[in-house]
Amino acid sequence: DSYINQSATFHSDRTNLNIKRGKCDFSFFNISIGHKLSLSLQNLITNPFNYMAFTNNIMIVRHRLLTELVKLWKNGELTTDKIDRLPLELSPRRSKHAGRCCVHKERAVWKYKSLPLLGLDMDDETDELTPLSEYAARAIERANNGKPKDNIMCVIDEACSACVQINYEITDLCRGCTARSCQYNCPKGAVHVHADTGKAWIDHDTCISCGICHKSCPYHAIVYIPVPCEESCPVKAISKDEHGIEHIDENKCIYCGKCMNACPFGAIFEISQTFDVLQRIRKGEQVVAIVAPSILGQFSTTIEQVYGAFRQIGFTDIIEVAQGAMSTVEHEAHELIEKLEEGQKFMTTSCCPSYIELVNKYIPDMKKYVSGTGSPMYYAARIAKEKYPDAKIVFVGPCVAKKSEVADQKIEGNADYVLTYSEIRAIMKAKDVELEACPNDNQTASTFGKRFANSGGVTAAVLESLKESDNCIDAKVCRANGSQECKKAL
């Protein structure tokens, strides 16, 4: 289950093809931003929301809340006082409220966490007295009359715990040793020793968080305390305001979603488009799902049954993004040969919108080396619109960053909405769709197109396409998983 841009990592000998053409030395980069997703039995937690893998309780809580909201929508109660009572039902009187001061705070957190799931953000808040039903009515009105919000992510200030900005702390494990390596190696004299106990302490007004004391202590008594969301952000796009609440700088953010995955209090949300899609279905419009190949690893039933479940949700048709991937392969293979013949020394893939954001915002000199070919989502959307000219196209995948690609006004003919797998599963559960009972819905696509979800899959498909067209080259492939590897490689 993924709320972030993740690249499921599988290893295949097919990604290490040696293709030769004269003496040409060409480097081809396969780029994806995010975490490598390692699925194992230890990571799969049996829970009431079967078929999905959750990595922590935050995802379960988020999934539960969205499921309850969709149930209210299904029953026509989303804009009634039933939704106003939802926080009370989720946190009843005298219930445990771990990490919060009281049950009333917990209820406020439930309320404000509902806003991004409804497709709103904190800028849409009026005040604390505005009922959730009014926000839900606004969300439905916007879904009926307009486009989804352009901003991709937001911080729920009520849920943010305002983590203390102290990076190093000396614990009770300090033995008060004679060496005092921490004190004598501190470049700012920020480490002091208590006269009575001999134990060290840090003056945080002087400390510059260099970590030398941490490395110097032979007892490992000095610990590093991160601010998880800030620590996880590869481009430092999230920081505290004057009230200690985190804020995301949209001008810096690359929408990788790592901060959302890292926050232990679940205070960072993507702006969901769930109700935008559901309203289109309810109004009887044609709504076509284009599904990423990584869906093969998301459910325990057959993929044909999963597609059958999509039909029961109300989708007009299901088209595999792997079909669009083959258009990406063909165009990118031709582009590769053209740039090679023009004397360019390397080219990177362009399927990951987080990577594109990274290059545009932080390494603009590398833009000319990024492939200009459209992503598989783009070509799959074009296939869908050729078949259903009046339909709304919904990309279904694991990636938050795809919402930034959809919101990009410079890309015409792309998908209209994006749903994550967890959002799809919440809809299934709320609408009582049982996967095992769903009829099969067959789809076919190229094996190489489906391997786009693998690490190195894009490169392998492009090189295989060149091989089949007799345009063989001696290609040196460089993989980069995650933004740090991307920056290092470039």
Regions found by a protein language model. Name each.
Residues 3-6, 11, 35, 42:
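Low-complexity, intrinsically disordered or signal/transmembrane-proximal segments
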Residues 11-16, 23:
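Intrinsic low-complexity, disordered N-terminal segments enriched in polar/charged/small residues
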Residues 3, 10, 26-29, 49-51:
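Aromatic (phenylalanine/tyrosine) cluster motif
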Residues 164-257, 261, 266-273, 280-285, ...:
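Glycine- and small hydrophobic-enriched segments that form the cores of compact globular domains
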Residues 14, 26-28, 40:
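Compositionally biased, low-complexity intrinsically disordered regions
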Residues 35, 40-125, 131-132, 270-490:
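Iron-sulfur-associated redox domains of electron-transfer enzymes in respiratory
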Residues 47-216, 220-227, 489:
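Ferredoxin-type iron-sulfur electron-transfer modules and their immediate structural context
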